[in-house]
């Protein structure tokens, strides 16, 4: 999110803030509720949204950047029993960037009588993104039933003295019959808006009318959410608003100017290489190779306290620990801590102090939105990384994100454009995508089958590369109990039958280059099923989550994988006495001619041991929906292979 600090004399200085843009706006809360028509009360279905559990009858969002306030009004029609869940309301917001208040709500019964909301509003954490804590005001409306209308309104206050880039999200989770939007811009900055996906059919583009930007929409289809799709907000109809100090319609000139300004700010923060030489001398040896020096500096920065990824502090802790802002890497060194961006700046300074060429690059992560240069939105460059030229090749590094292996980037910074800063405005460089073999899950199991058909034994899982990194980041602030539950739940989701699992080791949650290794005791009651004098065992023990992928025959959205990966299983199963192997499952091998996916299984036996191998490789990121049938066929082949049977019979 980009913000602008306002001074008493007028416009201030642009600064970047990482995070999501705020959901904003509505009508003045002092106004009366809108009238309710008989037609809306009697409505039982919406022909333009067949089968919908509920619809938005009306939405209004009014934002006033001159007063740092948004007003939001929402009215829904509950059409089915399933739709009653929309009586539980969540209003998301970032605590550090504003607050939600003046909440009013009511339920309109099918007979037109009113049940006002007079209950309690709660606050809960619902997500964390880039270190910013996303909270929600939550409440439950009274007497919500099929046929009723629920409506609520609230006011969002931004911090005084700041204005924020913003957006209107026109697509919602439900069909929207009618919606109105307005924005009163701050008059001392140029404001530009864009519509990345255009506008909903039948609606007109936003217009500037008497000092306000206005838009009305109607009959906007519900947004279709599907598994493995790009970030939702990237696919929704929306209007992005961006404040600029000076209007610049040419993207090339815009980014050149922005790059020069960013380079100047970075240079001031990083300082001169010679200033870092005393620190570098304590970290590296003169005889170290260039790569060894770089690795040591990387490890030195990565182990520093990273305030971006700490747990959310209480208000009391914030007041107690309040510190003046860092103005240079010297401040970061003095404190021994910094946020993710500051640590990457320190890494640049130390690498330069060691005689290496290191440049800071601004990057747009691809977990919430995709970066588009033509939109000229600096707020989309919401993170940074470091590019080091080592022996003629560029290394892309990010010690500012914990547990990132040396030579890799966090998954959401791979395969995207980055602006490598220099005094001429910078240059665009694509960040690398790691090879498919760099991120793996390797499962190894030694199991015994008893005469009742239950499997017991030991399972070892090695999470490698990005598969380890994202898990370590996700669990960084959790205790031992939650981490154990996290790993055990991952196993349970991959086995179709009820599995009893117990973690038996202490995984290394603080590592980065090393795999995350978890060891378990495992029991699967009744894995073998009896039919007559034979027993049947499904060969694909750990493939349940893959087998459930892309079950639907139709697809609306593109397919999106976070990063390329490989999964491999190596299972040795000991058969019980008195049982012989009647037949092994068929071997399977399926692969795309372009090597973007492959699947292979094999089975063999020796004496009373059965050896099963399984390999799955996904080497793609973004796939158009038109290729869904081919990809679905592949996963159906995976399902077929995993459902192959081992057949056992009584020994003579």
Could you tell me what each predicted segment is?
Residues 1-9:
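N-terminal secretory signal peptides that target proteins for export/translocation
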Residues 11-25:
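Bacterial N-terminal signal peptides
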Residues 29-652:
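A sensor for short, sequence-defined functional sites
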